[in-house]
């Protein structure tokens, strides 16, 4: 028939805890990637020209961490969405703290790689958990929300991070740390009572 599928709202109580538990890492990733060129120059004492290739390597380390987790390690772990999201957000909080305080480029690289690993756990956990939280007819609606969650933070993070970095170098990382900490707390407390499997069968 021509009946439209049911609309899924951001405020749906089946979905909202998953969104609250992940948005911090999306914002943090935007901050890290948009400020990496500045970090390389400031903490490595490099001129703009040689900093370009180092910045590319830092971003590659971040992507490598995410790919390693999603393609190789994650499937072998066999963890459910909630466990993946919690582990990813906890690691993100640790990695971002280390990146905020990193005194050398080697420390920046290690922290950036760890942020990629964290994303490689948290993002699939969120996507799977939010998808399982709704029924089959709502899958189209939830797919849009899943993709839009990251997109919205990517609109805000680059602009705000650049402005904040120009004001006080540590400020965008401190804001990101607060959001990651909030999301990490949500992943442990708000998701505690959710029965993902039963929601999917409704």
Language-model region placement:
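Symmetry-related core transmembrane helices of the 12-TM Major Facilitator Superfamily/SLC fold
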Residues: 172-189
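Short amphipathic helix-loop junctions that connect adjacent transmembrane helices
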Residues: 34-54
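Intracellular juxtamembrane helix-capping segments at the cytosolic ends
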Residues: 121-134
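Pair of pore-lining "gating" transmembrane helices in MFS-fold secondary transporters
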Residues: 12-32, 113-114
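Loop-to-transmembrane helix entry/capping segments in MFS-fold secondary transporters
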Residues: 52, 134-146
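Structural signature of the two symmetry-related core transmembrane helices
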Residues: 83-98
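Helix-to-loop junctions at the C-terminal end of transmembrane segments
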Residues: 68-81, 165
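Juxtamembrane intracellular "pre-TM" segments in multi-pass secondary transporters
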Residues: 1-21, 202
């Amino acid at each position: 028939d021509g009946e439209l599928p049911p609309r899924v709202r951001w405020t749906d109580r089946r979905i909202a805890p998953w969104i609250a538990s992940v948005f911090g890492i999306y914002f943090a990733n935007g901050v890290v990637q948009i400020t990496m060129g500045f970090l390389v120059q400031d903490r490595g004492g490099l001129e703009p020209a040689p900093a370009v290739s180092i910045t590319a390597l830092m971003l590659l380390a971040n992507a490598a961490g995410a790919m390693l987790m999603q393609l190789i390690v994650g499937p072998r772990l066999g963890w459910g969405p909630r466990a993946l999201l919690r582990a990813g957000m906890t690691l993100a909080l640790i990695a971002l703290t280390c990146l905020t305080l990193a005194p050398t480029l080697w420390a920046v690289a290690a922290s950036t790689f760890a942020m990629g690993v964290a994303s490689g756990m948290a993002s699939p956990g969120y996507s799977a958990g939010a998808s399982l939280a709704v029924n089959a007819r709502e899958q189209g609606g939830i797919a849009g929300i899943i993709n839009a969650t990251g997109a919205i933070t990517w609109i805000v993070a680059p602009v705000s991070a650049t402005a904040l970095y120009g004001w006080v170098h540590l400020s965008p990382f401190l804001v990101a740390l607060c959001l990651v900490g909030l999301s990490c707390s949500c992943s442990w407390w708000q998701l505690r009572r959710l029965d993902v499997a039963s929601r999917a069968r409704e």
